[in-house]
Amino acid sequence: MQTLIENVNIITPGEDIKTHQNVLIEDNLIKTITHDKISNDCMVIDGEDNYLLPGFIDCHTHIFAKGFHKEENMANPLGIHFYNAVPHSKQTINAGVTTIRDCGSADLSFKLAQQRKLFIAPKIHLSITPLVMTGGHFDLLLPSGWDMEIMYPGFPKGRCDGVEEVLKKTREVKRAGADFIKV
């Protein structure tokens, strides 16, 4: 399937705005950008007075989170968070964000489902769970003694102290599918 965006202004980082360009898209990939007329039998979008720019990258998101409500997180199985994240992912794409770095909430199954195009979502880079020191940000051991850290299969606990524990926890998080380590 081909789509042609005619007469659009293109913003590319580090370059001047290119005006009145024609962009041919084939199978969701840009095939041609030219000032010349393109005659193809395809869907045509009039881009006059509009701008086309590269997708944004959200470097810090929690795609599964709808705020941090410990009670809700504890009451729901992981699948509920997954299904809540699907429409959030589509909203993210519709806002022009084509890549996200999830800094602790999404698991490997979500990334694999996105890669298999089971739903509309940006490209996902996972941290699985952040590494935290005892008493630090995201250490959910409460003064009452209750540990509010949510445990799901595929989510190693993030609490670690000292070099040896951090190295071991890093290996566990990488094994769970992390693309990067959040500390």
Annotate each language-model stretch with its function.
Residues N40-C42, A178:
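Short acidic/histidine-rich motifs immediately flanking catalytic phosphotransfer sites
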Residues M1-S39, N50-L52:
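N-terminal metal-binding scaffold of metallo-dependent hydrolase/deaminase domains
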Residues Q21-N22, M43, P122:
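Extracytoplasmic/periplasmic beta-strand context in beta-sandwich domains
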Residues V8, V23, N28, D49, ...:
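Divalent metal-coordination and catalytic microenvironments
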Residues N50-R116, G135-L140:
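Metal-associated gating/positioning segment near the N- to mid-region
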Residues I30-T34, V44, I100-D102:
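Short, hydrophobic beta-strand segments that form beta-sheet elements in well-ordered domains
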Residues L118-V183:
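Metal-coordinating catalytic core of metallo-dependent amide/deamination hydrolases
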Residues I5, M43-I45, H125:
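Hydrophobic/aromatic beta-strand patches that form the interior of the parallel beta-sheet core
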